[in-house]
């Protein structure tokens, strides 16, 4: 019940960590790339006086209190954290002397401090690193460091927090850097940091929006178990209404900085009152199965939709394959490993002209590796990719330039794929310049046409990517991909980072362009709910292998493999009947 809106910075500092924890959205932006994971967990503990050094101060205070001696000054400043025993002992004696402690009480306090002190976790890491530099294998070096170097209670606490957040082999993981973790593991590390100081409230800001559905489900299940056992309240910020419906008891809907609707979760989502809430529910891809059913009820069967996709291509048969992947395999050499890692293992499929084929699977299933080989950005270890019946591995530089003109990518992060130093005009015009298409005046008019095609005003031509929203940047990326009038667009997680309304707009734009231009899409995604909105066929991948390939309706209504069923079961809100009328 305490009012904190007008609180001072110092008052907020006391609330952060111990009263309120945070799990942010993007772990790569919120984890320091040059700090070990364990160091970052320790930082959270130290910032809130819950580290080993603070325990030393507490032990000293208790020793003094036993003799009814009052410590003067700020106890938090008595000792500094990661210092070795001699320096800490000097500061301890100085602090005791300044506090007026002497004689037997002084000796007792110093003895207690000395007996309790053990080297910090940094000592183990330093020894392990020296062993590795001397040629000892990483696992063996860490084993020796743990066995022969006295550890601290901080080591155990950090490992305990990481293990509690669901990370296996937590002691080893604590020594690793963020780039050595998968997306799901990094998110678990952030959960460990957020809950390290046992806050009363945990603010989870889009904690799983970039993760695939099965990893998302495991992490959220684990987070629910943790917060429930700790008695921690959760403020869950999300654009995914399926997640909100499944995970929250109460929902607050915000629009342009104001609360427009609130109430019990199912009541709000089954009976939305505000127009904005109704738009959110209608656009939510987690609930898209109901929208597909209602489309069928209107008589739009799959064949009619497919005919619509290839309007204007009457000379071509529907079964004609524009992209064929034949027994594709890709292996990578891993550091310090003799065996090769097989990222893609004997995958075959074809993309029919004018249709959309989606490749789905968990992170690490090989989806993006397949996409990169189709785009000729990676060379297959074995197998072939055919474009209109031609083996792309036989292409010379001139052929490859022509191939690039006909097969274009749209990547997940438009801010990463658009040069931040290029204006929007230059970004869209660049492929036209590279392929020597038209003069300067013609290219300027073409850029305007492309912007109009993706429903962006011509006024954005002089702006830069950082001046646009995520959805606007993705529209620019699509306009750039459309500049050369391609036959195929490879969309690699093209809508996964967008909120539901923008995602819905981009998906509708892709559908409209497909109907108008007869485009073929290879759509890479971890979100099966999106797949149902846009795909004609689905390929399911697991551990680099193709485990299922069928039409979208067959995969969703009659999945053959248990892995596919697990993916479908993990779709947030997929089984909830919400108000879409």
Residue ranges and their predicted role:
Residues 1-3, 58, 137, 383-391:
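Conserved ABC transporter NBD signature motif
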Residues 196-200, 483-487, 503:
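A short, proline-enriched helix->beta-strand linker immediately N-terminal to the Walker B motif
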Residues 375:
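Helix-to-loop junction immediately C-terminal to a conserved catalytic motif
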């Amino acid at each position: 019940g305490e009012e904190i809106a007008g609180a001072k910075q110092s008052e907020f500092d006391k609330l952060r960590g111990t009263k309120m924890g945070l799990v942010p959205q993007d772990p790569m932006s919120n984890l320091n790339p040059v700090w070990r994971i364990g160091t970052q967990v320790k930082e959270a503990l130290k910032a809130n006086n819950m580290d080993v050094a603070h325990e030393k101060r507490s032990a000293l205070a208790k020793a003094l209190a036993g003799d009814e001696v009052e410590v003067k000054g700020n106890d938090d400043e008595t000792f500094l954290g990661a210092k070795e025993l001699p320096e800490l002992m000097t500061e301890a004696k100085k602090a005791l002397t300044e506090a007026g402690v002497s004689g037997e009480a002084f000796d007792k306090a110093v003895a207690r401090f000395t007996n309790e002190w053990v080297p910090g976790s940094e000592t183990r890491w330093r020894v392990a690193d020296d062993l590795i530099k001397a040629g000892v294998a990483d696992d063996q070096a860490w084993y020796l460091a743990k066995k022969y170097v006295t550890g601290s209670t901080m080591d155990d606490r950090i490992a305990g927090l990481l293990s509690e957040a669901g990370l296996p082999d937590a002691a080893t993981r604590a020594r690793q850097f963020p780039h050595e973790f998968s997306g799901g593991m990094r998110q678990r590390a952030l959960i460990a940091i957020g809950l390290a100081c046992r806050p009363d409230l945990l603010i989870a800001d889009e904690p799983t929006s970039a993760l695939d559905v099965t990893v998302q489900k495991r992490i959220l299940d684990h987070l629910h178990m943790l917060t429930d056992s700790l008695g921690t309240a959760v403020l869950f910020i999300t654009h995914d209404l399926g997640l909100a419906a499944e995970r929250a008891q109460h929902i607050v809907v915000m629009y342009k900085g104001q609360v427009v609707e609130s109430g019990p979760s199912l009541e709000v989502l089954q009976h939305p009152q505000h127009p904005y809430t109704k738009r959110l529910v209608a656009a939510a891809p987690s609930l898209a199965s109901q929208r597909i059913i209602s489309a069928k009820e209107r008589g739009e069967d799959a064949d009619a939709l497919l005919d619509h996709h290839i309007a204007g291509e009457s000379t071509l048969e529907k079964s004609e394959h524009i992209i064929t992947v034949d027994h594709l395999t890709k292996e990578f050499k891993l550091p310090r490993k003799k065996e090769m890692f097989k990222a893609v293992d004997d995958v075959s499929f074809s993309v029919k002209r004018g249709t959309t084929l989606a490749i789905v699977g968990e992170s690490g299933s090989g989806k993006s590796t397949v996409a990169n080989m189709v785009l000729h950005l990676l060379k297959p270890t074995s197998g072939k990719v055919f474009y209109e019946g031609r083996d792309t591995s036989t292409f010379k530089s001139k052929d490859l330039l022509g191939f690039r003109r006909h097969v274009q990518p749209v990547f997940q992060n438009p801010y990463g794929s658009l040069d931040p130093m290029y204006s929007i005009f230059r970004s869209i015009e660049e492929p036209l310049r590279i392929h020597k298409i038209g003069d300067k005046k013609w290219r300027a008019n073409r850029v305007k046409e492309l912007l109009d095609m993706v429903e962006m005003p011509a006024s954005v031509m002089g702006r830069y990517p950082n001046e646009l929203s995520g959805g606007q940047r993705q529209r620019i990326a699509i306009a750039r991909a459309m500049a050369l009038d391609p036959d195929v667009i490879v969309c690699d997680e093209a809508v996964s980072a967008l909120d539901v309304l923008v995602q819905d707009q981009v998906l509708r734009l892709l559908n409209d362009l497909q109907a108008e231009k007869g485009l073929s899409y290879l759509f890479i995604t971890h979100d099966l709910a999106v797949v149902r909105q846009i795909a004609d066929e689905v390929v399911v991948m697991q551990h680099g292998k193709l485990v299922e390939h069928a039409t979208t309706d067959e995969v969703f209504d009659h999945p053959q493999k248990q892995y596919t069923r697990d993916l479908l079961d993990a779709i947030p809100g997929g089984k909830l009947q919400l108000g879409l009328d």
